[in-house]
């Protein structure tokens, strides 16, 4: 399959602008506001003509229906300056405010779109990304993109129209001098083109460095207990300093070129201005007031033009950020082509000759076949890396098997609508995840409607009700980030309560009691045994004592099932299972 051609800068920027142009009304108001601002800027300079005429005792020309007597009066210039400045301020307000509204809306909508995309991307995407990079994408990159649209457009509107007004007035006053003045435009354009390539290249590296900073910080903060207990503070500081130094290095390179580009452009502009002033002094043959106005326009044009030269670096930063954002937005969501839905399934699960590998060179499962009848419990045991958790991932379609079939009640899971499939499976794994929400919300997670009575029933079955009621606000107590306010055993019992609340016909327990002490495990085992009644249950266990009553125990090794039978049968064989069992109880 051929790789799609990388979009050009123009194509990328058009796509960026499409997000902003959804707010056309704001754009129009902003454009009008900046148009008024630029027009008043030009008229404030025009007032100089009347000022000089007054100083030299010459009558001023009539304007806007005002007679020469009015324009030559003592109060005309001061009053005009105040009135024009007020109108200019009003224009600037509307221009800036409504362009800011565009930026805020673009940031919000783009963040929502990228997060919505991330939520539905396949698990394989997260296997190759770290959380720091993705957080940086949501925060830093999106702000860079928005800046390249709104800030660049704002500068283009405000300063672009100022330059247009100034040049127009200069052409009206003396078109020959003005044409000579603008001959420097090709030189300025060439300098900006050269710089733009460098800006975009370095901006990519800056964003990568920011992602690494976020990644290191996220890892260190999430694992702060491990960091402290192992004395890893200095190591983490060194890692963070390395990441920030890399960011500083590329940021310095970017600013160095940006800082160098600006004075070079100013020097070129100053040379054009110097030539213009020289020509005015030797060639001007009309009123001195016109010469003053023309020279002021030529000098004043430098400021808005200087702002326009900064658009380049802003846009290049945004385009570099847009590359990473559009790369994620253009990814395919996890496959969900299934149309069938199971209503009240019995829960028969069958795997036939299932093969799967995370990469082509290393197969994780080789020809796995087994069936679990409704109400049965099947346990998977084996060493780490034998393929137990991979089977769980395939059942939930975090990945799709490459060969063979997986069915529920005879229906291939690829034929089922994804949400419907997962609706019928409750998972409790060894990595307990709790959200920074109330205990009740964590137990009822994924449900649109919270049933307080069902929550308490589930908590009681999971042996969690008593400790929850002892918390300051009971079920409304915040769990803290990742359940930080709870012990490991408490977090695991809430996770079990969550599975009980879901009341799905298929239950997966992936080391579900691994975080519990022996006493808590005994207390909860009876609840789990009751939960299993009438449900298809797949158990992955390290503690073999927890699966002695399983209907079938499958022993796995290197992606294959090497033994199968109940507890006593496998012990009598004196094979792999018996060795594992005796090693735990020796």
Swiss-Prot record:
Domain ABC transmembrane type-1: 28-317
Enzyme class, UniProt record, top EC level: translocase
GO cellular component, one term: plasma membrane
PROSITE patterns: ABC_TM1F (PS50929), ABC_TRANSPORTER_1 (PS00211), ABC_TRANSPORTER_2 (PS50893), MSBA (PS51239)
Residues binding ATP, per UniProt: 382-389
Keywords on record: ATP-binding, Cell inner membrane, Cell membrane, Lipid transport, Membrane, Nucleotide-binding, Translocase, Transmembrane, Transmembrane helix, Transport
Entry-linked InterPro entries: AAA+_ATPase, ABC1_TM_dom, ABC1_TM_sf, ABC_transporter-like_ATP-bd, ABC_transporter-like_CS, ABC_transpr_lipidA, P-loop_NTPase, Type_1_exporter
Principal cellular location given in the protein's record: membrane
GO molecular function: ABC-type oligopeptide transporter activity; ATP binding; ATP hydrolysis activity; ATPase-coupled lipid transmembrane transporter activity
Transmembrane segments: 25-45, 74-94, 163-183, 264-284
Signal sequence coordinates: none
Pfam families (alphabetical): ABC_membrane, ABC_tran
Membrane topology per record: Multi-pass membrane protein
E.C. no: 7.5.2.6
Alphabetized NCBIfam families for the sequence: MsbA_lipidA
Domain notes: In MsbA the ATP-binding domain (NBD) and the transmembrane domain (TMD) are fused.
Record protein name field: ATP-dependent lipid A-core flippase
Organism (species): Saccharophagus degradans (strain 2-40 / ATCC 43961 / DSM 17024)
Name of the coding gene: msbA
């Amino acid at each position: 399959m051929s790789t799609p051609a990388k979009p050009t800068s123009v194509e990328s920027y058009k796509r960026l602008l499409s997000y902003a142009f959804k707010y056309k009304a704001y754009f129009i108001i902003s454009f009008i506001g900046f148009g008024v601002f630029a027009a008043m800027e030009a008229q404030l300079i025009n007032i100089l003509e009347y000022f000089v005429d007054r100083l030299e005792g010459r009558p001023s020309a009539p304007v806007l229906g005002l007679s020469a007597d009015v324009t030559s009066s003592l109060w005309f210039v001061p009053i005009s300056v105040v009135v024009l400045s007020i109108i200019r301020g009003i224009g600037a307000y509307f221009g800036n405010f409504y362009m800011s509204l565009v930026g805020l809306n673009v940031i919000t909508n783009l963040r929502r779109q990228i997060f919505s995309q991330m939520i539905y991307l396949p698990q394989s995407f997260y296997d190759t990304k770290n959380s720091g990079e993705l957080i940086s994408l949501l925060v830093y990159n999106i702000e860079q993109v928005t800046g390249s649209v709104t800030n660049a457009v704002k500068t283009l509107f405000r300063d672009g129209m100022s330059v247009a007004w100034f040049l127009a007035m200069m052409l009206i006053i003396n078109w020959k001098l003005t044409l000579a003045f603008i001959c420097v435009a090709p030189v300025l354009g060439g300098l900006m083109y050269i710089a733009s390539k460098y800006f975009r290249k370095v901006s990519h590296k800056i964003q990568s460095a920011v992602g690494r900073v976020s990644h290191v910080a996220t890892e260190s903060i999430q694992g702060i207990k491990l960091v402290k207990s192992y004395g890893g503070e200095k190591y983490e500081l060194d890692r963070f300093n390395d990441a920030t130094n890399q960011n500083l290095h590329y940021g310095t390179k970017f600013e160095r070129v940006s800082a160098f580009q600006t004075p070079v452009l100013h020097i070129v502009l100053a040379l054009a201005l110097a030539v213009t002033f020289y020509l005015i002094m030797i060639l001007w043959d009309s009123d001195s007031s016109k010469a003053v106005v023309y020279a002021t326009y030529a000098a004043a044009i430098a400021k808005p033009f200087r702002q326009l030269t900064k658009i380049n670096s802003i846009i290049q930063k945004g385009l570099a950020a847009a590359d990473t954002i559009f790369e994620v937005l253009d990814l395919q969501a996890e496959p969900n082509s299934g149309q069938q839905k199971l209503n009240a399934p019995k829960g028969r699960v069958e795997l036939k000759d299932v093969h799967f590998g995370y990469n082509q060179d290393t197969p994780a499962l080789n020809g796995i076949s087994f069936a679990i009848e409704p109400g049965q419990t099947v346990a998977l045991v084996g060493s780490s890396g034998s393929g137990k958790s991979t089977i769980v991932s395939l059942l939930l379609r975090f990945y799709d098997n490459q060969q063979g079939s997986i069915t529920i009640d005879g229906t291939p899971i690829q034929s089922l609508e994804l949400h419907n499939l997962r609706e019928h499976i409750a998972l409790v794994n060894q990595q307990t995840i709790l959200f920074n929400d109330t205990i009740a919300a964590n137990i009822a997670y994924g449900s649109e409607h919270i049933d307080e009575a069902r929550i308490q029933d589930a908590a009681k079955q999971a042996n969690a009700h008593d400790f929850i009621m002892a918390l300051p606000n009971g079920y409304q107590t915040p769990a803290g980030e990742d359940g930080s306010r709870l012990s490991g055993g408490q977090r695991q019992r809430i996770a079990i309560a969550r599975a009980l609340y879901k009341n799905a016909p298929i239950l997966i327990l992936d080391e579900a009691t691994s975080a519990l002490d022996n006493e808590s495990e005994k207390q909860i085992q009876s609840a789990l045994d009751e939960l299993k009644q009438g449900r298809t249950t797949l158990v992955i266990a390290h503690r073999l004592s927890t699966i002695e009553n399983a209907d079938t125990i499958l022993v796995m090794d290197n992606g294959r099932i090497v033994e199968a039978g109940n507890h006593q049968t496998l012990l009598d064989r004196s094979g792999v299972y018996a060795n594992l069992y005796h090693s735990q109880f020796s």
